[in-house]
Amino acid sequence: MLCGLTCSGKSTLARQLAEQGFVWLSMDQDAWDAGCREQPLPPAVQRQIKVEHKRRVRELVAAGRNVVLDYALVSRARRDEYRALAEDAGARVVLVHLNVPAVELHRRLAARNAGPRGPHQVVVALEQLDKWIATFEAPADDEGAVRVTAAELTQYPHAFAEIGEIGADRETQVNIGLGQASSPSPSQS
């Protein structure tokens, strides 16, 4: 499960995990496919996508697939809800908190808003980002999140090696453009 505000790097990481074989469940992608081009999303669209994603998480995990949930997960209650869903389906859950300072989020959002549009490049007003920043509940220590700050981004992939493999019985590599590390594959152990 990925956790972080708009422009924190969730979709970039999710894309890289998808390249390693994870099934990428993205609120942004499915909203884009439904015709939504701005944030925040209409509540009815959010509800519909969440129902479908919950069904898919249960189905995919039961089938032994690795899943990356690309959501903001802005509150503990929301994180607990999705953690319980995945664990009940048999998943080993890893929570990754992408913790980027507000000034950097603003810089990234301004650049994104000025660029081309796409599922992960929708227009978000800076004022909306400020509202999300004000209400975001960072994971507590007892949630066991792998925390990643802007200053630690070059060390970020190593966090997975410290907690073990993300993917079941296979090598997992993560490259966020600033460095790369991998957890050992069974043949390297």
Where are these regions (language model features)?
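Conserved nucleotide-binding/hydrolysis micro-motifs of P-loop NTPases
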Residues: 29-32, 74, 99-105, 153-154
